[in-house]
């Protein structure tokens, strides 16, 4: 099962993430957990989230980039759910070997994330990659959809189909491998 942990504080305003979730949702074996819908009070059900992670074959953290980071509820989710003794530390082996993909949308163009006057995309991924590796997870190449504020619907749909294809490719490789 592919588990998408989706965190967008204003999902009604996100055409890009909406398209991505629509495409992913057409696939069999995909569970989408929308954190802002599940936990509007930020009171996370840690046991339910850990159970979902335990069922997953692939975990995806999907969100818009906000100030070069994750939305606040996703950060809180990480702090609470990725607990010592469960996800890391002594006996913390629940996620060991489980693949994780970061799926992120940005308002800026791809060139905005090249190393230069701004931090490069690999630098921005480091905290998430470090978190995954600390929990014993396997970091997969991220999926990034850039320029989401100015993209026309055709471009958003094409990128969302590309996201769906990444998930299909993973499912096929996982089934055969």
From Swiss-Prot:
Its EC number is 1.6.5.2. One of its GO terms (biological process) is potassium ion transport. Regulatory subunit of a potassium efflux system that confers protection against electrophiles. Required for full activity of KefC. Shows redox enzymatic activity, but this enzymatic activity is not required for activation of KefC. It catalyses: a quinone + NADH + H(+) = a quinol + NAD(+); a quinone + NADPH + H(+) = a quinol + NADP(+). FMN binds at residues 8, 14-17, 65-68, 105-108. Belongs to the NAD(P)H dehydrogenase (quinone) family. KefF subfamily. This is Glutathione-regulated potassium-efflux system ancillary protein KefF. The gene is kefF. It is found in: Cell inner membrane. It is an enzyme of class 1 (oxidoreductase). Disulfide bonds: none annotated. Pfam families: Flavodoxin_2. Homodimer. Interacts with KefC. It comes from Klebsiella pneumoniae (strain 342). It is a peripheral membrane protein. Its cofactor is FMN. The keyword Cell membrane applies. Keywords: Cell inner membrane, Cell membrane, Flavoprotein, FMN, Membrane, NAD, Oxidoreductase. GO terms for cellular component: plasma membrane. GO terms for molecular function: electron transfer activity; FMN binding; NADH:ubiquinone reductase (non-electrogenic) activity; NADPH dehydrogenase (quinone) activity.
């Amino acid at each position: 099962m592919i588990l998408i942990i989706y965190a967008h504080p204003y999902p009604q305003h996100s055409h890009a993430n909406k398209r991505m979730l629509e495409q992913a949702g057409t696939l069999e074996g995909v569970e989408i957990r929308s954190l802002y819908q599940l936990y509007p009070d930020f009171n996370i059900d840690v046991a339910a989230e850990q159970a979902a992670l335990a069922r997953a074959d692939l975990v995806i953290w999907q969100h818009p980039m906000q100030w070069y980071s994750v939305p606040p509820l996703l950060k809180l989710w990480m702090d609470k759910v990725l607990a010592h003794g469960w996800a890391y530390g002594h006996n913390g082996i629940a996620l060991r070997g489980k693949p994780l993909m970061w799926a992120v949308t940005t308002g800026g163009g791809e060139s905005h994330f090249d190393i230069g006057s701004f931090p490069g995309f690999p630098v921005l991924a480091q905290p998430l990659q470090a978190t995954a590796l600390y929990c014993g997870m396997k970091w997969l190449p991220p999926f990034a959809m850039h320029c989401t504020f100015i993209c026309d619907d055709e471009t958003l749909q094409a990128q969302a189909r590309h996201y769906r294809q990444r998930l299909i490719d993973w499912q096929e490789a996982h089934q055969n491998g």
